[in-house]
Every structure is written in structure tokens, then in C-alpha cells.
């Protein structure tokens, strides 16, 4: 950041301590953030000449950006908090990566590549629809996909409550149960809901690529640092 260049305090907190902007606003509203020795106010803007403190500790402005790719195992959730008996992917990560935020998500029953970073601009560019980042999945259905349903999904799209869903499909086996699925959107459980709308259950959903980042041979439950 250039000297004197202003940014919103909640964005700064979200990027530096690994929380959402809403959580950052809660900290500010609760009087837990100080700027230059004074209690910060909602909507405040700061620059790198300011001293920002939380829990009596100064939060540095300059940070080294980290980018991770993880092969998320089935059964793990992408949130920071454990949900019921389901462990979180953060239980896999060592302490130095605990403040990283996920770039998009995979549901508990899905596996494959998930990205994590402390670079908010990178996360935005990877997830905002205007940047069109293709994601590739390997999907196994409970039965053979009928050619008519293949055409409906790939050529015309399926009407879902949150809009039309159109997926690229590539057959992976002669039984027509295994498919490579291409999509650039990221709606919640979109692939599962699309197939369910025409009568199929997704038995396996595994993401192998997110934008230019590929899973390659990374084992389940392992992670590696990547370059932006």
C-alpha cells in the first residue's frame, strides 16, 4: 500500500486477521478496535500511517500474501467452526495458516481442490462472476444419464429456484454414469441440484481444477503453497 492510500477499516481487519467483513464490523461496533489510540467507529477509513490495535496488539499493515491449494477430503466442512461431528478443513492446517480464508467452497460431501489465501483481491478475482473462472469436476451419478437429460443440462439449461443452470458435460465411461462437468458459476450445491432436478443423485463430486489451478496428484487431506 502506498503511503496515505486509504481503505476501509473493516476490509483491513478482514484481510489481516482472517475474519469476514461483518465480523470485523462487529468488533468495531463492540469497541474492540483502536485506531491511533482511540476507539474506532463503523465506516472508518485508515491508511498505513495509522496504528490499528486489537486485543492490545498492533496489526501490521504490510503482510506477505500466502496462496494454498488443498485436496479437501469428503466429510470436511470449509467453515472455521466444526458443524456437528463434521471436522473443519482448518483442523488440517498448521497454526501459521489458520488465518487464511477459503476461496469459494465445497460442501461436506464433495472433495477436491480448494484454495485458501490472505489476499482479498485474489479471492475476489477468483470468485466474482465477471472474471469467469472455469471449474472442472468429476461426477458420478446413481444411474446412467439419459441422452435427453444430457442435452437439457448442456444445451438448454435447467431451471432452478435461483436461476437457470447450464453445465458443460463430457462422458467419462460407456455406462454414462461418470462425467466431467465444466462450470464457471459457483452457486450453492449447483451441480447436485441440477442433476436432482432431472431425477439423478450425485454419488461422488470431486473438483479437479479451479481456474488455472489443478489438483494433479495432491493426496486427499494434503495441501501445498502455490503461486498467484
What do these predicted regions represent?
Residues 2-228:
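Basic, flexible Lys/Arg- and Gly-enriched helix-loop patches that mediate nucleic-acid binding at interfaces
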Amino acid at each position: 500500500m502506498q503511503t496515505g492510500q486509504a481503505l476501509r477499516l473493516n476490509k483491513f481487519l478482514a484481510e489481516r486477521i482472517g475474519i469476514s467483513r461483518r465480523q470485523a464490523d462487529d468488533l468495531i461496533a463492540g469497541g474492540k478496535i483502536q485506531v491511533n489510540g482511540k476507539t474506532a467507529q463503523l465506516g472508518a477509513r485508515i491508511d498505513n500511517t495509522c496504528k490499528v490495535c486489537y486485543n492490545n496488539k498492533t496489526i501490521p499493515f504490510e503482510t506477505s500474501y500466502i496462496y494454498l491449494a488443498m485436496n479437501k477430503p469428503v466429510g470436511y466442512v470449509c467453515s472455521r467452526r466444526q458443524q456437528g461431528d463434521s471436522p473443519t478443513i482448518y483442523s488440517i492446517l498448521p497454526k501459521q495458516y489458520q488465518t487464511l480464508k477459503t476461496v469459494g467452497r465445497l460442501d461436506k460431501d464433495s472433495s477436491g481442490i480448494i484454495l485458501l489465501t490472505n489476499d482479498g483481491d485474489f479471492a475476489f478475482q477468483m470468485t466474482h462472476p465477471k472474471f469467469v473462472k472455469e471449474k472442472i469436476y468429476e461426477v458420478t451419478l446413481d444411474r446412467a444419464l439419459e441422452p435427453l437429460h444430457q442435452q437439457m443440462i448442456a444445451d438448454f439449461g435447467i431451471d432452478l429456484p435461483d436461476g437457470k443452470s447450464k453445465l458443460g458435460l463430457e462422458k467419462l465411461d460407456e455406462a454414462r454414469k461418470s462425467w466431467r462437468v465444466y462450470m464457471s458459476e459457483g452457486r450453492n450445491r449447483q451441480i447436485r441440484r441440477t442433476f436432482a432436478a432431472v431425477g439423478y443423485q450425485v454419488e461422488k463430486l470431486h473438483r479437479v481444477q479451479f481456474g488455472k489451478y489443478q489438483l494433479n496428484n495432491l493426496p486427499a487431506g494434503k495441501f501445498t503453497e502455490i503461486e498467484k
